[in-house]
Amino acid sequence: MNFKYIVAVSILIASAYARSEENDIQSLSQRDVLEEESLREIRGIGAAILSAGKSALKGLAKGLAEHFGKRTAEDHEVMKRLEAAIHSLSQRDVLEEESLREIRGIGAAILSAGKSALKGLAKGLAEHFGKRTAEEHEMMKRLEAVMRDLDSLDYPEEASEMETRSFNQEEIANLYTKKEKRILGPILGLVSNALGGLLG
């Protein structure tokens, strides 16, 4: 009894397992079919897009060929004028390059002349001041003395501290006036002599 029961249960389990396997196989085959159909649809859509793209490109190429193959006389004239303008621009570039070379040459010549002129001026000044006469030397010595006196006016306490201690304020003012007169006279004379020498 028990043996029959075990056999019956085993048969039921085996049949259930077989049905499950069959269902799995059927499900897998259905999935494969769906995937295949999806792939076919995708390929069809891609082919349609590619075909449309090819047709569009062919139409564009044909339109461009017709447009440029059937240019009017006016279009041809415009193209000729454009080519002439490009040629003129290239010639202008050559002329501009030549002009730039000429300008550079002129600038170099001017710079060289300017350097020569400055060298000549410096040489002339060196010769002039290097060969001063005794009179000019004396005039320069007097000018240096005047400058020293001007310094003493700026700093009277340092220049003549011992001298100013015994004077009152009024005498100091008189001393400044005398010094200014004594200094301004030679300065004006030196300036007039220098201007006369330069202008003469």
Curated annotation (Swiss-Prot):
Q: Name one GO cellular component term.
A: extracellular region
Spell out the protein name for this chain: Bombinin-like peptides 3
What is its subcellular localisation? Secreted
According to its UniProt entry, what is the function of this protein? Has antimicrobial activity, but no hemolytic activity. Preference on killing Gram-negative non-enteric bacteria.
UniProt keyword list: Amidation, Amphibian defense peptide, Antibiotic, Antimicrobial, Cleavage on pair of basic residues, Repeat, Secreted, Signal
A single GO BP term for this record reads: defense response to bacterium
Q: Which organism is it from?
A: Bombina orientalis (Oriental fire-bellied toad)
Secretion signal span: 1-16
Family in the record: Belongs to the bombinin family.
Where's it mainly located?
secreted
Give a brief account of the tissues where this protein occurs: Expressed by the skin glands.
Modified residues annotated as Phenylalanine amide in this record: 68, 129
